[in-house]
A protein has these predicted regions:
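Short histidine
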Residues: 114-175
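Extreme N-terminus nucleophile/cap motif
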Residues: 1-57, 67, 158, 176-199
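Acidic loop->beta-strand submotif enriched in PP2C/PPM serine/threonine phosphatases
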Residues: 77-104
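Conserved beta-strand-loop-short alpha-helix elements that form
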Residues: 103-118
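A short acidic, glycine/proline-enriched capping/turn motif at secondary-structure boundaries
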Residues: 49, 73-76, 94, 112-115
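Short acidic-glycine loop/turn motifs at beta-strand connectors
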Residues: 34-39, 91, 165-170
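Histidine-centered active-site/metal-ligand motif
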Residues: 70, 85-86, 109
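Regulatory input/activation interfaces that engage signals or partners
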Residues: 65, 70-71, 75
Length: 199
């Protein structure tokens, strides 16, 4: 099902343990995006925890940074680096496969989008199709991310959760997120499973 973790500017970054747990519970690849110098920088396609943690550590993120992390469980288009998240907001499908990209706006998704789900689709995920066919036509400028009516319309179409970041470091969330000491999680798979044995 995936998980999104959004760290807005002024909030802590997730711990290494939290990152590890999210990857362990959503093991089909990871990525992240951050805003700097008016652009969103996306790095994705990390298919193992070590390469992901190395990349994140090299960024030296602090509470000043606005960062969205994503960990995937594949529901369409298989397990591959290209369909990990985040994606650039674009109307061109070929842009969805870029592993390292700068763009005005980036998107991460959690859930299944029935509108664009197609079990026979082997190349593009429901998220990639939703972004190119729907979102790219709806979001035209940075102010759109602060338009509650537009975000509600996107939520009704997607039927799931999204984090959308623009180059100004603003993060809009669509759907209900869990606030855990400032971090926003799209579900509870950031928590370690705790087993209790009863004698």
């Amino acid at each position: 099902m995936c998980i999104i973790c959004a760290s807005k500017s002024g909030v802590r970054q997730p711990t290494e343990r939290e990152l590890f747990t999210m990857f362990q519970n959503n093991p089909h690849g990871a990525g992240y995006m951050y805003a700097r110098d008016g652009r969103v920088h996306i790095h994705k396609g990390f298919m193992d925890i070590d390469s992901f943690l190395s990349a994140v550590k090299a960024e030296h993120f602090t509470a000043k940074d606005s960062v969205v992390y994503h960990f995937r469980i594949s529901t369409q288009a298989g397990v591959n680096p290209e369909m990990t998240h985040p994606f650039p907001l674009s109307n061109r499908l070929s842009h969805m496969k870029a592993l390292d990209v700068e763009c005005p706006c980036g998107v991460a998704h959690n859930g299944i989008i029935r509108l664009t789900s197609d079990p026979s689709q082997r190349e593009y995920s429901d998220t990639a199709l939703f972004i190119t066919h729907y979102m790219a036509r709806m979001v035209h400028g940075l102010d759109d991310l602060k338009d509650a009516q537009l975000l509600n319309r996107i939520e009704r179409l997607a039927g799931s959760k999204l984090a959308i970041m623009d180059g100004s470091v603003y993060i809009a969330t669509v759907g209900n997120f869990i606030n855990e000491r400032g971090l926003l999680f799209s579900n509870d798979s950031y928590r370690e499973l705790r087993w209790r044995h009863r004698a």
